[in-house]
Amino acid sequence: MASKAIFFFFVSAVCLSSLAGVAIADADDFDRFQIQGSVYCDTCRVQFVTRLSKFLEGAKVKLECRSRTNGTVTLTKEAVTDKTGSYRMEVTGDHEEEVCELVLVESPDSGCSDVSKEAYLRNAAKISLTANDGIVSHETRIVNPLGFMVQTPSAECPAAFKELGIVPDVTF
């Protein structure tokens, strides 16, 4: 009878120590984030992806985090897109007290290199880099696609908009 109690105690101790190791590993992951996004050429100058958009290989983006209180830059990191127009970067540390956003830096296509300066578009690239935000997937953050624009919209844009059932406030 005593040997069964010792065996049960030993098995319980092994199981509990295994769970403690998993909890520690998960706690370490809370301050490590994988950021994923993409960069495209906005051939219609509408700031959303259409069937005419082209994803850009070799585009540079920058992650910048600033203090909420004084605006001091606390983190800067750059990434370059692959052949599918996608980029990935890993960030460590909890940035709950900071405003973090991804911005376009450089386009590989000189014919598609305009960046909108509209304030509402900068909000589209903001990202939460804290585990204390209610997001279930605490490790991966997916950013809205960012787009460089051409100087003059493509002549095919009105047809693409008609297919979508929209008529944007754009002069062609």
UniProtKB/Swiss-Prot annotation:
Residues spanning the signal sequence: 1-27
InterPro entries associated with the record: Allergen_Ole_e_I_CS, Pollen_Ole_e1_allergen
GO annotation, cellular component aspect: extracellular space
Keywords tagged on the record: Disulfide bond, Glycoprotein, Secreted, Signal
Main location: secreted
Species, as recorded: Arabidopsis thaliana
Annotated localization: Secreted
UniProt-recorded name of the protein: Pollen-specific protein-like At4g18596
Similarity remark: Belongs to the Ole e I family.
Disulfide bonds listed in the record: C41-C112, C44-C157, C65-C100
Positions bearing carbohydrate: N70
